[in-house]
Amino acid sequence: MREIDVAVIGAGPSGLFAAYYAGFRGLSVAVVDALPEPGGQVTAMYPEKLIHDVAGFPAIRGRDLIANLVAQAAPFDPRYLLGTRAEKLTYVDGRPVLGLAGGEQLACGAVVITGGLGSFTPRPLPVAERFLGTGIVYFVPQPADLTNRDVLIVGGGDSAFDWASTLQPLARSVTLVHRRERFRAHAATVARVRALPVRIVVNAEVTRLHGGGTVTGAEITVRGGAAELLPVDTVVAALGFTADLGPLTEWGLRLDRRHIVVDSTMATNLPRVFAAGDITEYPGKVRLIATGFGEAATAVNNAAVVIDPAAHLFPGHSSDGS
């Protein structure tokens, strides 16, 4: 059985910053994630997209943000346990023991859960499933692959508009279709896309895709109107994701609609178990990468005091003594 001060579950931005902060506090740390590389949803879903709401960066690509976070934690030598998943939580002498897939166990001083949305599955576009991999995509790891393509984006959230903004300079044409008139995306993101040569069609749905082995066109039907056939060779379905917390639901955590309820110290209802990032829920919660960073620091600082009651909650600034 391995022993570690802090086990971080989830290697997304919040988890990577928690790993840095645990090291900064002189704590040994292991980071567990089911994905094969660090970065969580950023790496899996939008590594090339520009992120505009991280403090200090007017814009930064997803993969660059993750690389910076990994480099920031590197001096403290966090142990990455990737491609595996935390399945069980038990206690021995009041300390958490994580059971990992494959049978390995981690004895921890504290656990910090930063699993984002848990495991995530894209919501399907019903008319498009037979073209999956041959014209219909849910992620665009390499936007340059869509250079000179006619791209149809389906959805009205931030991801849909972010893809429109990212792909417009590359693609031959970009059309965004949403089944409602109002968008879930941030108003500034919508305004940025409206200023681009992107066609936006509201109150409409994709009712049929054309093509043999690959997509060649899409029928769009506006509510109460006739269908319009567009030349399309790539459809980006940005319809959101269904989240699955997996084994976490069996640990006895207090949950609220697939989120872990925490208090102002980021503590859960379980002893020595904290959480941070998108997976958490509390009054006034805002799900941003930026807020996840602060929550990660709060969780680790409070975990440090639980591990060693003689420790100070506030460890000083990282610039002290420099």
UniProtKB/Swiss-Prot annotation:
GO terms for molecular function: ferredoxin-NADP+ reductase activity; flavin adenine dinucleotide binding; NADP binding. Its cofactor is FAD. FAD binds at residues 14, 33, 41, 46, 86, 120, 278, 319. Keywords: FAD, Flavoprotein, NADP, Oxidoreductase. It catalyses: 2 reduced [2Fe-2S]-[ferredoxin] + NADP(+) + H(+) = 2 oxidized [2Fe-2S]-[ferredoxin] + NADPH. It holds the Pfam family Pyr_redox_2. Binds 1 FAD per subunit. Its EC number is 1.18.1.2. Belongs to the ferredoxin--NADP reductase type 2 family. PANTHER family: THIOREDOXIN REDUCTASE 1-RELATED-RELATED. Homodimer. This is Ferredoxin--NADP reductase. It comes from Salinispora arenicola (strain CNS-205).
